[in-house]
């Protein structure tokens, strides 16, 4: 647990420094993503992908909010480190001048492709999230009273995008519902995702976004759900899935480099969630983890065959589990990922900037 304590202390110091300076180091934080960072947008949707029930939020100060975690998500951690005095409001609840702090558009089960996650019901796709942001931008213009003023304000904000996981988990590797796995090679599928991703980034850029943090896909083949289904020993990750994830991530890095070279006035960076996650799994004791292959709350093999059910009693030693449920990291892991995204521990954590550096550019 020593490593976790050191990281928590460093996080507390960074937060104290930002608070001491007064305002957050970025005026606003816009979040696009899926269940890893959804903070309640799916609560009002007709969807199986919802987490607004106990024991989700068991360790969160506001209880079950729709976050797919026992506590904070990675973006909650980053929000604190940026110096905000409260978490970013989900789009479904954002009203008035609150949007000047930023908005969380993330939606559980969402993907880059429109059809991704449809078997789970309603969700807000990447394109839908960007469309919601365009609506937010028009509101920012109305509040600030001038397009130039709004453009200047928005250019200083952080735009975090973390999508693609469901395009593999709830599309490419789900042949019962989707044909993409037989239509595309892993390389061709990643190209298709990157092309669609690029379209949305251009829309965001045309609506004032200038500081982008593109979060790579984690090692989905190591999740309790995949281990329960596809691992003979319940420990060995599914390399078929992880290999496809690495192909996408490699192309995302190339996209960051391309945009940095060809997009006037904008800065892009890549957050290596895959590498940070792999470090936690390979060196669990460094972070105080004892269980890397099972959910703290779930049903069946690896607590991963069915995800955490309403009212189910979770494990008591939650900080010792990398995973909270069948798919999602717990707060302890999110603190590690969020902290290293904000201030990289090694050069490989972020390319070419960490989020703190991006905010100060």
Swiss-Prot record:
Chain segments annotated as coiled-coil in the UniProt record: none
Signal sequence interval, chain numbering: 1-22
Gene3D superfamilies for this protein: SGNH hydrolase
CDD domains: SGNH_plant_lipase_like
Pfam families, per database record: Lipase_GDSL
Intracellular or extracellular location(s): Secreted
GO MF, any single term: hydrolase activity, acting on ester bonds
Keywords: Hydrolase, Lipid degradation, Lipid metabolism, Secreted, Signal
InterPro entries noted in UniProt: GDSL, GDSL_esterase/lipase, SGNH_hydro_sf, SGNH_plant_lipase-like
EC number: 3.1.1.-
Single GO cellular component term: extracellular region
GO biological process, one term: lipid catabolic process
Family from the record: Belongs to the 'GDSL' lipolytic enzyme family.
Protein name per UniProt: GDSL esterase/lipase At4g18970
């Amino acid at each position: 647990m020593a490593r976790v304590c050191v990281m928590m202390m460093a996080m507390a110091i960074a937060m104290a420094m930002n608070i001491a300076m007064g305002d957050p180091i970025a005026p606003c934080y816009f979040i696009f993503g899926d269940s890893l960072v959804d903070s309640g947008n799916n609560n009002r949707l007709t969807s199986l992908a919802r987490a607004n029930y106990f024991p989700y939020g068991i360790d969160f100060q506001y209880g079950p909010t729709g976050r797919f975690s026992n506590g904070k998500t990675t973006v909650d951690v980053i929000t604190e480190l940026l110096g905000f005095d409260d978490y970013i409001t989900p789009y479904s609840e954002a009203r008035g001048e609150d949007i000047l702090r930023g908005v969380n558009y993330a939606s559980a089960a969402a993907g880059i492709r429109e059809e991704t996650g449809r078997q789970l019901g309603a969700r807000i796709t990447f394109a839908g999230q960007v469309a919601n942001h365009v609506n937010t931008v028009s509101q920012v213009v109305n509040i600030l009273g001038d397009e130039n003023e709004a453009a200047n304000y928005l250019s200083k904000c952080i735009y975090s995008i973390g999508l693609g996981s469901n395009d593999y988990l709830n599309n490419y590797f789900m042949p019962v519902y989707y044909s993409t796995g037989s239509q595309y090679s892993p390389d061709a599928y990643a190209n298709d995702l990157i092309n669609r991703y690029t379209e949305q980034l251009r829309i965001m850029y045309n609506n004032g976004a200038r500081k982008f943090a593109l979060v790579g896909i984690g090692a989905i083949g190591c999740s309790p759900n995949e281990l329960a289904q596809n691992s003979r020993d319940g420990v060995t990750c599914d390399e078929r899935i992880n290999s496809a994830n690495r192909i996408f991530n490699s192309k995302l890095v190339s996209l960051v480099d391309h945009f940095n070279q060809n997009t006037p006035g904008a800065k892009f960076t890549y957050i290596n969630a895959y590498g940070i996650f792999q470090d936690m799994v390979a060196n669990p004791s460094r972070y105080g983890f004892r269980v890397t292959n099972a959910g703290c709350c779930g049903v069946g093999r690896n607590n991963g065959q069915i995800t955490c059910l309403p009212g189910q009693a979770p494990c008591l030693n939650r900080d010792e589990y990398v995973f909270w449920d069948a798919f999602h990291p717990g707060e302890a892991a999110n603190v590690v990922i969020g902290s290293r995204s904000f201030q990289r521990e090694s050069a490989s954590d972020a390319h070419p900037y960490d989020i703190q550096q991006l905010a100060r550019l």
